[in-house]
């Protein structure tokens, strides 16, 4: 029953809805021209009225216009009555409406101006919000800064503290501060304040570097050197090779300052002090270097792309440079002249080289050529001066008979001091002052040479002496040519005796002196040959008497055995076995007389030349 009752109601509602749709369509068709469809659809009363009309009968429809007219007239009359009764209200309403209209215009204008100003106001608000946020952020930062005031102050005072540590030599604390600043830089490198602190700390580190290197330029001991190099390594500004170079440069500057301060007026004093300072301080520097740096091969090979540096070559090159500089100074001072101290100077230099052998820098082998050059140069200079003095004496010499000469008829009998094995000068030279002075000067040169007389100079010394004797021979011949025409028979005999003494006494005596300086056995042992074969190597250690005799042969008397005895006397000495070294080397005694003044024949006693 319930279901049967529900179905008709649904059908009725559907039929009503369909009816309304049809009415609306019909009304739309009828009043298309009078009422737009949108208008009556929007006004419910119009639609309701039209639907009411559509449901009225014909009679009502006929009376409807009249009713509407009457209702209209009635409404108009009511409106008039209302207007008449309330005209003041309408007037006030109109005035109010007009005023409101004006006010609305003002409001509209104000709103327009407001709308025009709103964008700038909006931007100002944004700026205000931004500034407020910045102020708030700054306030927070200021609050945080105030809370961290102590920590910030400590950071800001790092440059001042770093400078104080460096200037007061608190290098350990300075390195800790530098490490802390490097960590700050890695974390906060974008902060300008941190960058400023880093720059100031770098300046202090540069000052610290200068101070440390300056300490190496002073008389610093090994413990202090170790500390300084440790600081430099921790600063990490040099590679290992650069650090070695810096160390050697600084220590070399200190050593050069010491050597430069030595007075240079006296060559012997200068070179002795130079040897002492170089030996002591160079040894200290080498000891310091070896204690600080290791020349062992690295445990790890160098990384790819890295240049391999031979660090040990740095040190050895520096040592070679120092040795070369010392040898240059030594040779310079030796050539300037050191008097008779060549032997003591050689001993000091040898001790210097021996001390360096403990550090692998023995340079004694380089000393021999230096002393040889100086010794032969000094000897050659002395020989040259001797020849020049002989030339001066011969220019003013006059042949005057002397008792020693005139009282003897046999010349060899008057020469008892020229027997083999003796070093006493021939006394017969006293009768001829130029020859005596010449021999004296030669013996002085020999005595100076004896202090430092290496076997290697045998040939050079012999050659220099032969050249000097050859020049003396030429001087004698020049004297003969100049004076021969004015010679008397006595003067001619004296001149012959002069030449005979020169060749038979002076030259053989010089040969014996050469054999004392350069023993033939020692020369043969040095050459590694028997003494009997020494003559095959030329005139080593003896003068060629025949070469000197030849220019004077036309003056001398015809005697075939003039030099036979002397050559036989020299022969055993050249071939004798090497003697045992004496406790003290025999000394070459010069001839007694001094050179005469004004060419007088009288001779005066002269003290013998004494070697140092």
From Swiss-Prot:
The entry's keywords: Congenital disorder of glycosylation, Golgi apparatus, Membrane, Protein transport, Transport
Region (Disordered): 568-612
Gene Ontology cellular component list: Golgi apparatus; Golgi membrane; Golgi transport complex; membrane; trans-Golgi network membrane
Transcription recorded as keyword: no
Gene Ontology terms describing biological process: glycosylation; Golgi organization; intra-Golgi vesicle-mediated transport; protein transport; retrograde transport, vesicle recycling within Golgi
Keyword Cell membrane appears in the UniProt entry: no
Membrane topology qualifier: Peripheral membrane protein
SUPFAM superfamilies: Cullin repeat-like
Subcellular location: Golgi apparatus membrane
Pfam family, one: Dor1
Main location group: Golgi
Organism superkingdom: Eukaryota
Clinical note on disease: Congenital disorder of glycosylation 2H: CDGs are a family of severe inherited diseases caused by a defect in protein N-glycosylation. They are characterized by under-glycosylated serum proteins. These multisystem disorders present with a wide variety of clinical features, such as disorders of the nervous system development, psychomotor retardation, dysmorphic features, hypotonia, coagulation disorders, and immunodeficiency. The broad spectrum of features reflects the critical role of N-glycoproteins during embryonic development, differentiation, and maintenance of cell functions.
Family listed: Belongs to the COG8 family.
Function of the molecule: Required for normal Golgi function.
SUBUNIT field: Component of the conserved oligomeric Golgi complex which is composed of eight different subunits and is required for normal Golgi morphology and localization.
Protein's recorded name: Conserved oligomeric Golgi complex subunit 8
Name of the gene encoding the protein in the UniProt record: COG8
């Amino acid at each position: 029953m319930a279901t049967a009752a529900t179905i008709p109601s649904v059908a009725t509602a559907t039929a009503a809805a369909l009816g309304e749709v049809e009415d609306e369509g019909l009304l739309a068709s009828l009043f298309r021209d009078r009422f737009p469809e949108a208008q009556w659809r929007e006004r419910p009363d119009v639609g309701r009225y039209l639907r009411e009309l559509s449901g009225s009968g014909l009679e009502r429809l006929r009376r409807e216009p009249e009713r509407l007219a009457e209702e209209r007239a009635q409404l108009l009359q009511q409106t008039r009555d209302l207007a008449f009764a309330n005209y003041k209200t309408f007037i006030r309403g109109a005035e109010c409406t007009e005023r409101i209209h004006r006010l609305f215009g003002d409001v509209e204008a104000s709103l327009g101006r407001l709308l025009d100003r709103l964008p700038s106001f909006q931007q100002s608000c944004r700026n205000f919000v931004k500034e407020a946020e910045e102020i708030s952020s700054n306030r927070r930062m200021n609050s945080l800064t105030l809370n961290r005031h102590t920590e910030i102050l400590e950071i800001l005072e790092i440059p001042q503290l770093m400078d104080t540590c460096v200037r007061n030599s608190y290098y350990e604390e300075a390195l800790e501060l530098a490490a802390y600043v490097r960590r700050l830089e890695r974390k906060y490198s974008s902060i300008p304040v941190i960058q400023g602190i880093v720059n100031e700390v770098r300046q202090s580190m540069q000052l610290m570097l200068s101070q440390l290197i300056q300490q190496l330029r002073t008389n610093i001991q090994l413990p202090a050197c170790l500390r300084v190099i440790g600081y430099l390594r921790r600063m990490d500004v040099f590679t290992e090779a650069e650090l070695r170079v810096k160390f050697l440069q600084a220590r070399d500057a200190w050593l050069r300052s010491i050597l430069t301060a030595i007075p240079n007026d006296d060559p012997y004093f200068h070179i002795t002090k130079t040897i002492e300072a170089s030996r002591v301080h160079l040894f200290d520097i080498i000891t310091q270097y070896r204690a600080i740096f290791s020349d062992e091969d690295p445990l790890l090979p160098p990384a790819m792309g890295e240049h391999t540096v031979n660090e040990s070559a740095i040190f050895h090159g520096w040592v070679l440079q120092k040795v070369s500089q010392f040898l240059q100074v030594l040779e310079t001072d030796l050539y300037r002249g050191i008097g008779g101290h060549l032997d003591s100077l050689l001993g000091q230099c040898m001790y210097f080289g021996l001390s360096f052998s403990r550090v692998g820098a023995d340079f004694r082998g380089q000393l021999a050529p230096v002393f040889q050059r100086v010794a032969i140069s000094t000897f050659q200079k002395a020989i040259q001066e001797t020849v020049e003095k002989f030339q001066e004496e011969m220019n003013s010499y006059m042949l005057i008979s002397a008792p020693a000469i005139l009282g003897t008829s046999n010349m060899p009998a008057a020469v008892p001091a020229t027997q083999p094995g003796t070093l006493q000068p021939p006394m017969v030279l006293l009768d001829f002052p130029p020859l005596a002075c010449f021999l004296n000067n030669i013996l002085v040169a020999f005595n100076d040479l004896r202090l430092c007389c290496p076997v290697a100079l045998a040939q050079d010394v012999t050659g220099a002496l032969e050249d000097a004797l050859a020049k003396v021979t030429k001087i004698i011949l020049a004297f003969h040519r100049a004076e021969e025409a004015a010679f008397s028979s006595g003067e001619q005999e004296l001149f012959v005796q002069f030449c005979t003494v020169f060749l038979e006494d002076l030259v053989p005596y010089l040969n014996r002196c050469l054999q004392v300086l350069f023993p033939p056995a020692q020369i043969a042992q040095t050459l590694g040959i028997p003494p009997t074969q020494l003559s095959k190597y030329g005139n080593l250690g003896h003068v060629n008497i025949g070469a000197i005799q030849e220019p004077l042969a036309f003056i001398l008397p015809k005697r075939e055995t003039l030099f036979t005895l002397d050559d036989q006397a020299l022969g055993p000495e050249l071939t004798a076995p090497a003697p045992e070294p004496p406790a003290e080397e025999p000394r070459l005694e010069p001839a007694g007389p001094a050179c005469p003044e004004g060419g007088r024949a009288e001779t005066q006693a002269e003290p013998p030349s004494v070697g140092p």
